[in-house]
């Protein structure tokens, strides 16, 4: 059994459902300390975070390449729907099954072993290696990576490159990497009316009827045209609720929850202003609360994306695609202190599902890609 596969199985065997790390990071610390990494643990509201650094011979003047990942996993769902116990690593048909196999314990194991091999081959490496690991990525993400980033910001520390081990591959290992992510902003809208008997609409004010024209305009609005890296911004309704459940009562208010996924072609302030303008145009009496979950970030083509593309091509023969599709990731926090953030990891078809798995044949190539990037950028 390869060292990468063995470490992946050790991590899967720990039921680290958010925010419980189940001592996964302790296992990583033991491996990294043996390589000469200095580490610190940052805990916040039950979340465990790890920042570990091994300086190169150039010290703080050299480039720093970080790996960012999460030891936490999503809940298993109904156990009876799994064909094997989710926290007992199981081999079947050339695949390794277990919660977190693809998202993202194989990636973490891969970068740890890649670092071990790199340090052994390049003991006088010029640049520095770092790990930023959290147990709060799959949950609220309020006490995880963001807390480490804030601590690093406070003392003036930065990264030059960061690889986030998210499972980005689609059909073949390495066919897609993420060089950015869209921002996410949600709104909770309450349109006020006047409750009344449905037989006497002149004595009431139906908020659903008042809302409908504005809602149609919001749905039809083209918010931007996107750009070279991002598709156009989208606006989607997630929930609509009004009424008491009775068939003879006009509701007193209508509630709508919606979400923007927006690119660098738009701003939070600009999108909010346009929504308010449409609602005001329709003379609605309303309350609107906004929640910004993350701002968009983008890494243009550069040293990290080029090194990763070359490593993937040399290891797998695959020509990778830069993409910004999908949901948010912790890359949005890391981009505050790192100019080049790229996500790369295994196939994502089974993540968050029952019978999550990774192809065993992909585990060593994944590790080798990470090692090749280390060799290109900081040897």
UniProtKB/Swiss-Prot annotation:
Its EC number is 3.5.1.18. Its cofactor is Zn(2+); Co(2+). Zn(2+) 2 binds at residues 103, 138, 352. It comes from the Bacteria. It holds the Pfam family M20_dimer. This is Succinyl-diaminopimelate desuccinylase. Signal peptide: none annotated. HAMAP family: DapE. Pathway: Amino-acid biosynthesis; L-lysine biosynthesis via DAP pathway; LL-2,6-diaminopimelate from (S)-tetrahydrodipicolinate (succinylase route): step 3/3. The lineage of its organism: Bacteria, Pseudomonadati, Pseudomonadota, Betaproteobacteria, Burkholderiales. Keywords: Amino-acid biosynthesis, Cobalt, Diaminopimelate biosynthesis, Hydrolase, Lysine biosynthesis, Metal-binding, Zinc. Belongs to the peptidase M20A family. DapE subfamily. CDD domains: M20_DapE_proteobac (cd03891). Catalyzes the hydrolysis of N-succinyl-L,L-diaminopimelic acid (SDAP), forming succinate and LL-2,6-diaminopimelate (DAP), an intermediate involved in the bacterial biosynthesis of lysine and meso-diaminopimelic acid, an essential component of bacterial cell walls. PANTHER family: ACETYLORNITHINE DEACETYLASE (PTHR43808), N-ACETYL-L-CITRULLINE DEACETYLASE (PTHR43808:SF31). GO terms for molecular function: acetylornithine deacetylase activity; cobalt ion binding; succinyl-diaminopimelate desuccinylase activity; zinc ion binding.
């Amino acid at each position: 059994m390869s060292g990468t596969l063995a470490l992946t199985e050790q991590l899967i065997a720990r039921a680290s459902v958010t925010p419980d790390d189940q001592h996964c990071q302790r296992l990583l610390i033991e491996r990294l300390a043996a390589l000469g990494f200095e580490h610190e643990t940052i805990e916040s509201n039950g979340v465990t975070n790890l920042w570990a650094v091994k300086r190169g011979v150039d010290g703080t003047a050299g480039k720093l390449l970080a790996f960012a990942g999460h030891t936490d996993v999503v809940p298993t769902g109904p156990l009876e729907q799994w064909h094997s116990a989710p926290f007992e690593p199981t081999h079947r048909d050339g695949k390794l099954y277990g919660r977190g196999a693809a998202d993202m314990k194989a990636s973490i194991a891969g970068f740890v072993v890649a670092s071990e091999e790199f340090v052994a081959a390049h003991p006088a490496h010029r640049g520095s290696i770092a790990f930023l690991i959290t147990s709060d990525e799959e949950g609220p993400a309020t006490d995880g990576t963001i807390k480490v980033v804030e601590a690093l910001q406070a003392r003036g520390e930065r990264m030059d490159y960061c690889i986030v081990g998210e499972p980005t591959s689609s059909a073949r290992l390495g066919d897609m990497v993420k060089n950015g992510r869209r921002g996410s902003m949600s709104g909770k809208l309450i349109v006020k009316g006047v409750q009344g008997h449905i037989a006497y609409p002149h004595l009431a004010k139906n908020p659903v009827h008042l809302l409908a024209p504005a809602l149609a305009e919001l749905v039809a609005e083209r918010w931007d045209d996107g750009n070279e890296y991002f598709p156009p911004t989208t606006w989607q309704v997630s929930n609509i609720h009004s009424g008491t459940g009775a068939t003879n009562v006009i509701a007193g208010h209508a509630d709508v929850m919606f979400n923007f996924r927006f690119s660098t072609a738009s701003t939070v302030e600009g999108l909010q202003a346009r929504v308010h303008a449409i609602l005001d145009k329709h003379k609605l009496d309303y309350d609107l609360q906004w929640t910004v979950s993350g701002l968009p970030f983008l890494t243009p083509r550069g040293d990290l994306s080029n090194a990763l593309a070359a490593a993937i091509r040399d290891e797998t023969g695959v020509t990778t695609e830069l993409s910004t599709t999908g949901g948010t990731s912790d890359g949005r926090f890391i981009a505050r202190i790192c100019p080049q953030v790229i996500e790369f990891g295994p196939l994502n078809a089974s993540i968050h599902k029952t019978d999550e798995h990774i192809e065993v044949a992909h585990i060593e190539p994944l590790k080798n890609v990470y090692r090749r990037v280390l060799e290109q950028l900081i040897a």
